[in-house]
Amino acid sequence: SSAASDVYKRQELFKPSQALNECLNCCSLDSSGYVAVHLRFVNALENFEKDQFNSLTEDKRENLIQRCLKGIRLIIDQNKNKQIVVFSDSKVFLERVKVLPVIVLDGKVGHISFTENTHEVAMKTFVDFYAISKACRVIRILAPEMYNTVFSYYAAVLGGIIPEELHV
């Protein structure tokens, strides 16, 4: 609801720590608005989450990457004067997407439940979440091989943004 969104915007429930604000300020994101694009692969491209099996053949992995890159190219074309910031749980994809004119934030990618370096991973998770919440558009890219995440959905809710989906 609008009232709930106002509570989030005023940061009555969630207030970033000084450390988180410092990390966000280092991101150099356009204050006039940027588009956040979020993709959640789980183990579709690499195996980093224990007991989460989504093993694809090399051909199917490449096909999925190409479909996602095509989707991001479409988003770039539709948002010519905006920064496009890509968020993902896949190191492989974040490296591949750098061929496009997009921003990928620094930090250790991982899932808090599956890592030993939890502080660095947790900070990256919070930076991503808050950066997504401050975007002017939030687009979640989905495919049958990908995880139907709500991470970016809730970040959009925090920012009072209507989340969008692009199926590839």
Locate the predicted segments by residue.
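A donor-sugar binding/catalytic signature common to diverse glycosyltransferases
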Residues: 125-168
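Catalytic donor nucleotide-activated moiety binding site of glycosyltransferases and closely related
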Residues: 38-46, 51, 69-72, 76-117
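Donor nucleotide-activated moiety binding/catalytic core segment of transferases
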Residues: 62-64, 104-141
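Short, small-residue-biased leader/transition segments that mark boundaries at the very start
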Residues: 1-8
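Well-ordered, non-membrane alpha-helical segments in soluble/globular domains
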Residues: 55-74, 124
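Nucleotide-sugar donor-binding and catalytic loop/hinge architecture
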Residues: 16-34
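Short, flexible/disordered intra-domain loops and linkers
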Residues: 46-61, 113-122, 144-147
